[in-house]
Structure formats: structure tokens, C-alpha cells
A protein has these predicted regions:
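Short, compositionally biased P/S/T/A/G/V-rich stretches that sit at domain boundaries
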Residues: 106-136
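Amphipathic, heptad-repeat alpha-helical segments
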Residues: 47-79, 124-131, 135-141, 220-255
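Short substrate-entry loop that stabilizes the transition state in hydrolases
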Residues: 323, 331-336, 341-381, 461
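Primarily recognizes the serine-hydrolase "nucleophile elbow" in alpha/beta-hydrolase
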Residues: 403-448
């Protein structure tokens, strides 16, 4: 459950310019638009609210990673109630209660139950003053405090061991006794070279050890001055600079500038690498040279733009080579299948990469050598670009196998997946909707597109999925419908993704 990186003002000002809006029935629109204002307001709050958003994302990732390893019918039964509470708290805007419920679900994976000490450890937040520091900063300050209260709170004891890592190499470390529930610690950073590091914090109590979710810390020389210069250079770029290049540069600069301010982003950005990339792009564009927004295997943030319509996206270029049978012998760069993943309300382009099974879809695409694109959605403006524009943006960076473009959407993203596909059915081989849906206005558009419709038996979005499935059955269209027992709205994506990818790979209709 990751929170949006945009703001309400940008969503509203783009309304007259964007065609790719959700086509909702009147009742759904009445329900979603107030929800959109509630959710999009969250990032505009001060630092504490943005840190709560970040901490909630870390809790979800910790739970989903544990659930992926320990999933079973019995485990699903134990986590069902706290997950339902988490979803309810999230949509009511209570991030603290949502985080507590997620931790309860994580602890419930162990059938033996959790001790008061384990409950306390899970309740703790590790908060950085900033995730981006200037080169030569003497030390990094971090704060350990409870994210929420517990009925029973053991006394804080043990040692907090902190280390900054590049890969698994320890570059700086320190240890301090943990004696207070709210306590500030410091890690020496004066001797760190420029780069992007992972902060590892472990609590040791005798033979017991608890490791907190790792966070990123970036060290770079003069970040404020360099970002200010970048802003001036971007404003001076030639008018003929391609819109997608300029928009990607501007959006990335905005994310980096936020790291220096009071807000905490929802995800871990490799800020040093991104800043150097922006400087390289800016220099090339100033000389009138073309740039490549993605140059090889890895993950990228891009902002393709057509006219005044744009989409902030996260892209996976997998490192695995395609099987020989899938490669065209004459192509120097082999076209790859593409999955377009559409998140639910309150999410962003980072949600499928960080959540929904701790980024499970990334692993599934990596294993197959498939490209993955996750655009940011808004209940008010949709994706910004239609499917042809999104596919073309990826194809400009790495050839896309146009015969194998798949779309998967969750909740609001499921509705958007139906809308986008109905407007460009020739672009999509197969479509999957999870935990959401609405009446399809043009069912005939799906004559050649098999649909996977999945919902949890305890999912409040189940009715929408069933409505779409019913339309497909009545029209005699190709459909695979799955209902997952003891699964609710948050867990449906993680639970169903294996079936979704099996469905995508099937050559015969189900």
C-alpha cells in the first residue's frame, strides 16, 4: 500500500488537457471523487505525515515479504481480520491505525502468536532527518520511536546496531544502547564517498535479533546548489527540446528537490545516481543532442508526454535474456513482451514495484524477461496517456513485442484497464482485473481479448469483478474467473499474480 507522489493541484490543473479519464457510472463517480480528494490531500501535509506514509509502505513491504514465504490457508485465515482493518483505516485516512493493523497481520503469520517484545519491535519506526545529505556531513541522525501505542509495553533494552551498506559491504557503522522508547541515534557519515547506501538497523537483546526494514541514504556533493543550477538550465533549454525528455528531467528534479525539503517520498530513490543522470541529460539537451531515458537492464522513472498529456511511470528493463524460441534471429535487440500494471486508488507508479507482494510482479517479469511499465493513475485524470502512447514510450527505449502486450489492474486500476483496453483493443493480447470493475459499455471491443477476473471472497471490490464477468459470460467472450477464499482487497493482487501470469502465458483460450 504505497501513497501518491503527486499533489492535488497538479491533478486538477491537468483536467482539461487529459483524455484518458476514468469512465465511471454516476454512483461510482460520486463515491470515488471525495475519496480522491481525501487521498490526494495526504502528501500535502507536513513532514510527519509524509514520514507516516513512508513508514506504512515499509510495514506493508515487510508483511508481504513474510506472507509470500509463509502463505497457506491457515495463514490467510489468521491475517484476514487485521488486513480488513488495515484497508478500512487506509481509506479513512488513518495511517497510524493502518500501520498497526498491518503489523498485527505480520505477527499473525506465526501460529504461535507474538510476545509483547515482538509486538514492541514491530511498532517501532526508524525515521531519518533526510534521505539525502551533502558530502562531508559529519553524521546521520535517526530517530527510533513507537509508531503507535500498545496495551503492554516492555522496557526498552538491548543495543541498536546501525550500518550503512553498499551492496553488503559495511561502509560505516555504530552501536548505542537502547534505553528509551523515543530516542535519537547517530551514524558517522563524514568519511562516506558519494553514492547511494542502504541503512541497516538491528536491535539485539541477548541472543535475539530484530532487523528493521532497510532504508536508502544518498550522499552527494552540494545537492541544493546543483539542483538549483539544474532548474535554471532546464528553463533555458531550447524550445524544440522533445517534450518527453524535458518532462522526465523536470519530474525527476522535482522528486530530488523534495528529498531536501520537509517531505519524505513514498519510495527509496537512488538520489545520487538520479542527480548525476539529470546533469548528464541537461548537458546533452543543451547541446541539442538526443538522450536515452533507459540505457540497459534496471529500473527507471520516465515521463512520456504527447502534446500536453503526460504520464509519470516506473519502468523495468529486465536483465534476463529471452528464450531463443522467443527471439527473432534478425533483430539486434530482441522485442520483449510488455506488462502494463495499473494500481489502485491511493497508489502511484511505485506501488507495483514496492508493494502488491513486496514487488512480486517485478520478480515475475524478471523471471520471464518481460518489460514492465507502471504509470501513475488518478481517479480524476486516469493515466494521462492512452495505451498507444504508453506502449510507444517503452518501445522507444526497448523494442516491444506488439503481439504480447498484457494489462493488469487492481481496484481503480482494474476499471481503468477496462477503459483503456476498450479504446485500443488491438493493442492488448490479454487483460486481468483484480478486486475491481464496473459495467463495460462496449463489450464487443473485447471479442479477441481473453479476460482474467479475480477477486477475494472477502473483497469489497468483488461485486464489480462479478459484474464484468457476468457481462463477458452473457456475451460469450473468453473468460477465466477466480474467487479466492479468505482474501480481501489488499491481498488479492499478491495472491492472484501467479495465476495472472499463467493466464498471460497461455497460448490457448481457457
Amino acid at each position: 500500500m504505497v501513497f501518491p507522489a503527486g499533489d492535488l493541484a497538479s491533478a486538477v490543473t491537468s483536467l482539461p488537457r487529459v483524455r484518458s479519464t476514468l469512465q465511471l457510472d454516476p454512483l461510482t463517480r460520486v463515491l470515488l471523487i471525495p475519496l480522491a480528494f481525501c487521498i490526494w490531500w495526504i502528501p500535502m501535509q507536513p513532514c510527519r505525515a509524509s514520514d507516516l506514509r513512508y513508514q506504512l509502505g515499509k510495514r506493508v513491504h515487510r508483511f508481504e515479504a513474510a506472507w509470500e514465504e509463509r502463505d497457506s490457508p491457515e495463514a490467510r485465515a489468521r491475517v484476514l481480520t487485521p488486513l480488513q482493518a488495515a484497508v478500512s483505516a487506509f481509506f479513512s485516512g488513518n495511517q497510524t491505525a493502518a500501520g498497526k493493523a498491518i503489523d498485527q497481520a505480520c505477527l499473525a503469520l506465526d501460529e504461535a502468536g507474538a510476545s509483547p517484545e515482538q509486538q514492541l519491535w514491530h511498532s517501532l519506526n526508524i525515521s531519518l532527518a533526510t534521505p539525502l545529505i551533502p558530502l562531508g556531513t559529519p553524521e546521520l541522525e535517526l530517530r527510533v520511536e513507537r509508531g503507535y501505542k500498545l496495551p503492554e509495553t516492555p522496557e526498552p533494552t538491548g543495543m541498536m546496531e546501525m550500518a550503512l551498506l553498499r551492496g553488503e559491504q559495511v561502509c560505516s557503522e555504530g552501536a548505542t544502547p537502547w534505553t528509551q522508547l523515543s530516542q535519537t541515534f547517530a551514524v558517522p557519515t563524514a568519511d562516506l564517498a558519494e553514492g547511494d547506501y542502504r541503512l541497516r538497523v538491528r536491535l539485539k537483546q541477548g541472543e535475539r535479533q530484530f532487523e528493521f526494514p532497510r532504508q536508502m541514504l544518498s550522499v552527494t556533493a552540494n545537492p541544493a546548489r546543483r539542483l538549483s543550477k539544474l532548474a535554471d538550465d532546464e528553463a533555458a533549454l531550447p524550445e524544440e527540446t522533445p517534450k518527453s525528455f524535458r518532462r522526465t528531467l523536470r519530474d525527476t528534479m522535482k522528486e530530488l528537490t523534495g528529498l531536501l525539503g520537509a517531505s519524505r517520498p513514498e519510495t527509496d530513490y537512488p538520489a545520487h545516481a538520479l542527480l548525476e543522470q539529470c546533469e548528464s541529460w541537461s548537458s546533452q539537451l543543451a547541446r541539442g543532442e538526443a538522450i536515452r531515458l533507459a540505457t540497459g537492464p534496471g529500473q527507471y522513472w520516465i515521463s512520456p508526454q504527447e502534446d500536453r498529456r503526460a504520464a509519470r511511470c516506473r519502468l523495468l528493463w529486465p536483465s534476463k535474456q529471452l528464450p531463443v524460441a522467443d527471439q527473432a534471429a534478425t533483430d539486434p535487440v530482441k522485442p520483449r513482451p510488455l506488462v502494463i500494471a495499473l494500481h489502485g486508488a491511493g497508489g502511484s507508479e511505485n506501488m507495483f514495484f514496492d508493494a502488491y507482494g513486496a514487488g512480486k510482479i517485478v520478480r515475475l517479469c524478471e523471471e520471464r524477461g518481460w518489460l514492465l511499465l507502471a504509470p501513475r493513475l488518478s481517479p480524476l485524470t486516469g493515466t494521462g496517456l492512452e495505451l498507444p502512447g504508453l506502449i510507444a514510450a517503452v518501445d522507444a527505449l526497448h523494442p516491444v513485442d506488439r503481439r504480447k502486450v498484457f494489462v493488469v489492474g487492481h481496484s481503480m486500476g482494474a476499471m481503468q484497464g477496462l477503459n483503456l483496453t476498450s479504446r485500443s483493443p488491438e493493442m492488448v493480447k490479454r487483460l486481468a482485473i483484480l478486486g475491481g470493475g464496473q459495467r463495460v459499455r462496449q463489450v464487443d471491443a473485447f471479442q479477441q481479448i481473453p479476460l482474467f477476473a479475480g477477486a477475494g471472497a472477502e473483497d469489497f471490490g468483488r461485486g464489480g469483478v462479478q459484474q464484468v464477468a457476468r457481462q463477458f459470460r452473457q456475451a460469450g467472450l473468453t473468460l477465466e474467473e477466480r474467487d479466492y477464499s479468505q482474501v480481501e482487497h489488499l491481498g488479492i493482487v499478491q495472491v492472484a499474480l501467479d495465476d495472472v501470469f499463467r493466464f498471460f502465458e497461455a497460448e490457448e483460450t481457457p
